[in-house]
Amino acid sequence: MNSVPVMLFSISILLAAMLTEGRGLTQTQKESIFSAEHKSDLKSYLEMLVCRRLRDVPESVIHISKVSKEILPDDLLSTYLLELLVCFDKDKLVQSKGIVFNTIKRLLTNT
């Protein structure tokens, strides 16, 4: 019952690893040095990309629930929250947990 969410999470981790494979520095290259301002800009840019990606997750949750009737909505919600936990601060997740649960439950009941 929990195998599909775990499989989806594993696939997303593997894809991220494959995309970054082979991008290490060679011996002749020097590591770039970022100032604190650049690091904060990079962090905000990455958070923006993650937010854009996570906006599509509820649609994926609905699609999975339509395809597989064995998966309970709570399993889908816990998978989505795990994805959020990986991407954001735990404090931000705790604040938005109720909103996320209500939104996904509403979307699942409308299907």
UniProtKB/Swiss-Prot annotation:
Keywords attached to this entry: Behavior, Pheromone, Secreted, Signal
Signal peptide: 1-24
A cellular component term, taken from the record's GO annotations: extracellular space
Subcellular location: Secreted
InterPro entries: Esp1/Esp22
Single biological process term from Gene Ontology: negative regulation of male mating behavior
GO molecular function: pheromone activity
Entry's transmembrane regions: none
Tissue distribution: Expressed in acinar cells of the lacrimal gland from where it is secreted into tears. Not detected in a range of other tissues tested including other exocrine glands, internal organs and sensory epithelia.
Described purpose of this protein according to its UniProt entry: Pheromone produced by juveniles which activates a small number of vomeronasal organ sensory neurons and exhibits a powerful inhibitory effect on adult male mating behavior.
Family from the record: Belongs to the exocrine gland-secreted peptide family.
Full protein name: Exocrine gland-secreted peptide 22
Source organism (scientific name): Mus musculus
Gene from which this protein is expressed: Esp22
